[in-house]
Amino acid sequence: MMIKQAEFITSAVSITDLPKDDFDHFLILGRSNVGKSSLINAITNRKKLARVSQTPGKTITLNLYLLNQSLYLVDAPGYGYAKRSKTQTLTFMRMINEYIQLNGHLKKIILLVDFNIGPTQDDLDMYIELQAFDVDIIVVTTKYDKVKSSHRLKQEKVIRSKFFEGQKIYFTSSETKFGIDKLINEEFSNE
């Protein structure tokens, strides 16, 4: 699938704020600063569609981007940000749970993991928690280019060992676009 059109539509804090149409949603989850906005920009081939911040915890709403007038990429706030208060963390978790449980258009959850660091305990906890929902989960690693090529195969094996057998995992780099076309063609092509 070729992404010909991409635009920011809205920010939502509740299920009632979502657009009232029938387009499929693809939720992008991951730790703060894992590269969610950069991945959206790489998928859409637009450098500044999603604002990229060097400061963790900037995204506090669900940000919806409409692709090809047919599906939404939904950028969620990052989890695991230490400077968020417990109240903010609970509000975030409630918003995500409500979105997953009540959004009848959620097609897939894309869980981002930093390839260089590997899955953190927060990533693994989120992965286990997501198993309770009847939604396809895709693991996408980011920052593949940050690891020396001689160490990549070993890191791929380490990452695969942390998830359930048969889990679909994509290795990507927003910087070099490595793996982006494969992700688009395999996960968004039928949309």
From Swiss-Prot:
Record-linked HAMAP family: GTPase_EngB
Gene Ontology biological-process annotations: division septum assembly
GO molecular function: GTP binding; metal ion binding
Keywords (A to Z) from UniProt: Cell cycle, Cell division, GTP-binding, Magnesium, Metal-binding, Nucleotide-binding, Septation
Gene it is expressed from: engB
Co-factor(s): Mg(2+)
SUPFAM superfamilies found in the cross-reference section: P-loop containing nucleoside triphosphate hydrolases
Highest taxon, organism lineage: Bacteria
Official protein name in the record: Probable GTP-binding protein EngB
PROSITE patterns attached to this UniProt entry: G_ENGB (PS51706)
Binding site for GTP: 30-37, 57-61, 75-78, 142-145, 172-174
GO cellular component: cytosol
